[in-house]
Design a protein with these regions (language model features):
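Basic, helix-initiating cap at the start of DNA-binding domains
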Residues: 1-46, 63-66
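Hydrophobic/aromatic residues within well-ordered alpha-helical segments
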Residues: 19, 72, 76, 90, ...
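Helical hydrophobic small-molecule/effector-binding pocket
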Residues: 87-115, 144-150, 169-173
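Helix-turn-helix/winged-helix DNA-binding modules
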Residues: 35-36, 56, 149
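Amphipathic alpha-helical interaction segments
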Residues: 22, 42, 63, 92-100, ...
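Short hydrophobic/aromatic patch on the recognition helix
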Residues: 48-58
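Hydrophobic alpha-helical connector segments
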Residues: 67, 74, 78-106, 120-123
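C-terminal peripheral helix-coil segments that are non-catalytic and often amphipathic
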Residues: 1-7, 133, 137-145, 163, ...
């Protein structure tokens, strides 16, 4: 008879990066279900880890929240870089990225609240700066293509995401309309394409 593995023994066999990934995934699920006030022992249980394991990886809940935000920002940075290199062209790649990020935001209740909580965290600031630089490169490429208005900046993207986030509170799917309007506003002047 083969002995059953306990969650603790499975945890012990994981690499450090797998442990971190499992904790972040569990934290995202628990925070989405229970809110940011969810206790660390609940997150540990969801990950199949002991509470001490959580605190070894993340000394405080603030550090755990920051790691979640950094993970999402890194995904956005990677998306912006991939979009800039896309064969679809900078404008199409930019709008595709905006749709993907807005949909993630609309379905990820934790991200906005966590970002507001840990926006001043040093790791979040570094990741935000890298993401902003990647978005600036994508905007420059779309601007050079002639499809993005000349005065568009990453601040405009932040405003657009704030508006789409607010629209999720109004009505199901309202964020889509807000994003459509925002993308139209970002486009360079074209006949018949003015708001």
């Amino acid at each position: 008879m083969i002995p059953l593995r306990t969650p603790a023994s499975c945890w012990a066999e994981l690499s450090a990066s797998d442990k971190r990934a499992r904790l972040l995934r569990a934290a995202g699920e628990v925070f989405a279900r229970d809110g940011l006030d969810a206790p660390m022992p609940v997150i540990a249980a969801a990950a199949g880890a002991g509470v001490g394991s959580v605190y070894r990886q993340f000394p405080s809940k603030r550090d755990l929240l920051a790691a979640l935000v950094v993970e999402r920002l890194n995904e956005a940075e990677e998306g912006a870089e991939a979009a800039r290199r896309s064969a679809a062209g900078p404008w199409s790649a930019l709008t595709g990225l905006l749709w993907a990020l807005a949909e993630r935001q609309a379905t990820d209740d934790v991200l906005g609240e966590a970002m507001a909580t840990v926006s001043e965290h040093a790791q979040v600031q570094v990741a935000l700066e890298r993401t902003t630089q990647a978005l600036e490169r994508l905007l420059a490429a779309a601007r050079a293509e002639g499809r993005l208005r000349a005065d568009a900046t990453t601040l405009d993207l932040r405003l657009l995401f704030a508006a789409t986030r607010a629209a999720t509170q109004l009505e199901a799917g309202a964020w889509r309309r807000m994003l459509e309007l925002g993308i139209d506003a970002l486009q360079a002047d074209q006949p018949g394409n003015r708001l």
